[in-house]
Amino acid sequence: MDDNKKAMRKLKLHVAISIDGCIAGPNNEMDWIDFTWNDKLREYEDRLHEPVDTIILGRKMTNEFISYWSNVMNKPEDPEHSFAKKMIETPKIVFTKTLNKSEWPNTEIATGDLKDEIIKLKSQEGGDIIVYRGASFDSSLIKENLIDEFYLFINPVAIGNGRTIFKDLKEIRKFNLIESIAFDSGTVLLHYEVKKN
């Protein structure tokens, strides 16, 4: 690679998904997700998030995300405590058309065209960028082919009817498998990168 040409930042999707391809029930139910926090999962999450310095969120997901991790961070005995600290301290960008300024600490607002904003963000100096579950937001990112790596935590459950993230694709997308890890809960992590043409 040309030394003068810097690499783009990677955008990673981190999501729990059922074996029938749903990330939430029809009314956003998530009680079927098993994310048992043990040493193996903690070590993996720490490794995954180590190069990440920006979190992006859709507006609908933001309150829930920040509220959950803020509550965990206030419980030092919680096994997720150290991870929660990283979630709260990592700068966040919320994509919204309804807000002009942030309601949350350590958070900026992005109101422009999604594709333009993400391309601009990926071209800036910095570490990797990560996005979490949010069916409509994730679907938009996937449709625009903006996600570089997928971290799919396949839960051993089929829910039959729910919200998916690949339904808006208009063409076949192919991926390279980078890693797979089975956890004691039966959840399997599949780490894919988008296959370049």
Show where each model-derived region lies.
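Enzymes that bind and transform nitrogen-containing heteroaromatic metabolites
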Residues: 2-197
